[in-house]
Amino acid sequence: MRLDKLLVTRGFFSSRERAQDAIVQKTVSVDGTIVDKPSKETAEDAAIEVIDIFNKYVSRGGLKLEKAIVDFGLDFTGKTVLDVGSSTGGFTDCALKHGAAFVTAVDVGTGQLHPSLQGLPQVQSIENRDFRELTPEEVGGRRYDFIVSDVSFISLSYIIPYFAPFIKEDGQCVLLIKPQFEAGASFLNKSGIVTDEKGYKIAIQRVTQEAVIHRLYLNQINISTLFEKVKNVEFISLFSHTDTRYHLDYNVLFKTVKEVKKGLK
């Protein structure tokens, strides 16, 4: 039986989508071996163990930042972090659990930050505030080691121009690039999803070109965590003031996208 189906049959998950999420995240072992293919044929009496990663952070966003930390070899220990578009606080929670000393969480909404993060001495929550209107005085003139951002319904190209007063000269930016908010309406299907590689490329280029204008250079990029096969493809990216002459091979990147999508089928 397919592993994702078996996990539901044996009661590990309520749906195949959730089972697929867990498998792709490499949290399912079969007879002592981690399996990352939902379609893997598995004996019905196999010894299965599951690590519940979905309770690891206050939201799944934390898993996306965690992937950047692992893929890019980032060290948040003792660092200061500005979380732009913090929402529930997945990025904030992940940063703290990876050793960040202080996080300023900024969001245009109100009352979204998870209760477990509210009131923490190492978290400054600024609500009902468009980041583009944030002043250095509101954060005590602090410049941050990291700016992290997962925003929706707005292009990062409108956010990046406002990073300068808040980022240290040797700071880094971890940005989630969402093609559905970058590529333009012509690339969206009826479900509002970008599935075309040309759309992915345009989205990435829109962000990187705006970043260069503000002396922020792409250092690394990879596909972000995919949770369900119906969801948008997103890219986690790393920028800094250091031009590493990073060569983005779109063929390699999009090959990875295809492989991950195939694994979810």
Positions of the model-derived regions?
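S-adenosyl-L-methionine
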Residues: 104-156
